[in-house]
Amino acid sequence: MTSSAFDSSRQGCGSGQCACRRAAQTRRADPFDDTDYGTPTRHADTDVTLDIDGRAIAVPAGTSVMRAAIEAGINVPKLCATDSLEPFGSCRLCLVEIEGRRGYPASCTTPVEAGMKVRTQSDRLQALRRNVMELYISDHPLDCLTCAANGDCELQDMAGAVGLREVRYGFDGKNHLSDAKDESNPYFSYDPSKCIVCNRCVRACEETQGTFALTIASRGFESRVAASAGEAFMDSECVSCGACVAACPTATLVEKSVARLGQPEHEIVTTCAYCGVGCALKAEMKGEQVVRMTPHKNGLANEGHACVKGRFAWGYATHKDRITKPMIREKITDAWREVSWDEAIGYAAARFRRIQDEHGRDSIGGITSSRCTNEETYLVQKLVRAAFGNNNVDTCARVCHSPTGYGLKTTLGESAGTQTFASVGSADVIVVIGANPTDGHPVFGSRLKRRVREGAQLIVVDPRRIDLVDGPHVKAVHHLQLRPGTNVALVNALAHVIVTEGLVDEAFVAERCEPQAFDVWRAFAARPENSPEATADIAGVPADAVRAAARLYATGGRAAIFYGLGVTEHAQGSTMVMGIANLAMATGNLGIEGAGVNPLRGQNNVQGSCDMGSFPHELPGYRHIGDAAVRARFDEAWSTTLQPEPGLRIPNMFDAALDGSFKGLYCQGEDIVQSDPNTQHVAAALASLDCLVVQDIFLNETAKYAHVFLPGATFLEKDGTFTNAERRISRVRRAMRPLSGYADWEVTLMLSRALGYDMHYAHPSEIMDEIARLTPTFAGVSYALLDELGSVQWPCNDAAPQGTPTMHVDQFVRGKGKFVITQYIASPEKVTPRYPLILTTGRILSQYNVGAQTRRTENVRWHGEDRLEIHPHDANDRGIRTGDWVGVASRAGQTVLRALVTERMQPGVVYTTFHFPESGANVITTDSSDWATNCPEYKVTAVQVAPVAQPSEWQRAYTRFRAEQLALLEQRTAERAPAIATGK
């Protein structure tokens, strides 16, 4: 969406009349309309009426003639035009006649005018179009019957549309029919012999993705699409988002899965199960088999775009490692035994009940998954509270965004972000703190880059030199490259400038915020120790840069902050979130389009798992378990008596397991061994349990310690909803039958029933209906509404029946905004002569979280191992070169990684990812955590790095344990084989 679709002034937006909201309302009219209108929609305050083929048609000013015609049901042939890209006018197929104008203008590049008279059909136009098509066909292979795009080819369709039945030009002259294919990319092929040089792929790479990896090389007849400097796609800057493939009107760029399986027969609109962007996708199917995944053009979170993971990395769903039958064993040293669902569920329930009989009601608990649906996480927390009879339930949000919930609820009154992703298109200043959107949230990252190319000014706060700092046609105005662990010192310095230089929005603060709290905060921020000069030595950021960034944020127009785990995963994570909220309130950057505070949540349903009451102290809707009135409402609905005391958090569960008071755990869709800090501590805790029940699709690192394995279902095998980082609730629709026979919600129902607490639901829609009855912010949510609108952002209730795109418009959820003192306290993780470097961790584009899904796809071609990034200065001091094996040691443990020497790092800081279990990234992270929420401090670990020649002791032990567990899994298969053979 271009900036012209938004009102860029600070006033007026938020009334419901701004262009961006009208756009949303227009698009919501039919969220499943897949028509390609040729050029993007335009929004204007006035309509223009024109005549097309004798019909009076009214459209917004600025609309192209092509779009006006197609919206009216008048077909105009086109090849270079598509409504996801700006008009280009190169194919000359969409020519029309306009009364009073000479020649035949291209309808895609011609805007409508009042009183204009247009003809789209005439003998002359038909002849011109046929001649254009003949020229295209004259240099195009005539292998339609065997072509992968047969039946889904715009060139083929347009040849029919213009009535082309024969070609006068032969293939005797020079042509491109023998040009070599590029098969280097694992997901799609490039066949230049079929290219018509329409530029759609190049424009998609530039406009939609913003990578600028493609170009048109040479001129005239020699023109061809080239990746970077004529490299193979796999060796180029291409990030395999698939935008070029989606844009291609021929078989020049085509998915290899389509070439292999043929054209899909039907499609199901669903929601991606990777990051927190929540892209709407179409699962294009042939029977029960996925042929391809394509971005849904009307998905409001992604607007027809996707990334390499959502677009292509879906093969894990049918990977050979999938476990589809329940398994049990007495001890973790025993071989697994495949059993029926009834036996597995009964075995798990009996062991849980025995534990509670021997060790008490609070000796067991559950962990929900941020990869499962809202309905499934709701059921797990309900099972724990009603069937287990305690509040020992937690979620992986504990180890990522729990400080977001605490910090935003304290200051603003709600545990969620304030904007839509689309509203970045009306931001004048964009601040990215502790996030790497181009890797972690790539579709939103592309939107952000587009807005920066349009003129928004970008501030990046990050220890690393991420792509946004200086990428293709995108450059940050300020990069505040702070030292890890000093976030709060820096945010206080920014606040100091805003307060002492008179940049506070006094009117906003007086009207919207608690005056006493603001006065106290203002005095705190103005203290000399919070000045940029005083904090420069702490954070490592020059005072002049801090002052310039603060001034830009406060005075540059609508300013939006987007932050990630680089904010939350710190000992002062909650403090930093509140510091960010302080900045937004002080400058009035809340409650309007293009401004706000937005956590970029990492997994597909982190927001939803929190919304559904997955924390030990909160019920669905973030209502405290200690509130008797709230408890009474749930007691009545659930026919039970809830306990008033908060239960154990995940770290507390581990500690209690090691001291013998916590003996059983139900873990759904979460690999805590690989993802939680201090792996040795986690593994020891799980090994001490009497019963660990894991529900997952693979035998992950946690499942290797399990006594019961309940096979899970992928997002393709279930119905439900996900809630993305912008509070958008979207439908997940089943595209194939669960390979195990049951969706995850059905398994939880069976376990609850076996425990003596029966829950009755025939479909996830009934679970959502119950959520709506019990949760005020979800009161208006239903599957019928989601099917009507496509998606909805909570709060959705009587006050906001179609959802709430922008939070805190007239007042904060808590009434008045609350400024909070954010005193900087140094991290307990300090560099010493023994551990002189700081390790910080994160993600990379091609992999996802612990990698269980992406490691089982071709994405390993881009990132097949975790590497340690280190600055040349630190590498030279240690005699380290790229590719060398290096030992990384902390006070918690040691592992060995391959080095990558890069100036993306600053001296004194090293970085790695955590996608591969054998890397042991969390062997070296420690127990240091956020003071308010226990969110681990993954971003600050003091380490030493040195060249080594062999794996670490932990890696050798891990390799042995993994081999033992896989052997026990194989024994299960070997033991069953004779019985199966005999049965046949």
List the model feature ranges, each with a label.
Residues 421, 717-738, 747-756:
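Glycine/threonine-rich phosphate-binding loop and adjacent beta-strand/alpha-helix elements that clamp
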Residues 600, 607-610, 615, 764-858:
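Long, low-complexity segments enriched in small/aliphatic residues
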Residues 4-5, 12-14, 18-38, 92-240, ...:
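Fe-S ferredoxin-like electron-transfer domains
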Residues 51, 114-120, 230, 474-482, ...:
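Short beta-alpha connecting loops at secondary-structure transitions
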Residues 141, 198, 203, 259-718, ...:
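Catalytic alpha/large subunits of respiratory electron-transfer oxidoreductases
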Residues 738, 742-792, 798, 858-869, ...:
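Long, contiguous, secondary-structure-rich segments that constitute the structural scaffold
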Residues 57-114:
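N-terminal cofactor/phosphate-binding cores enriched in small/glycine residues
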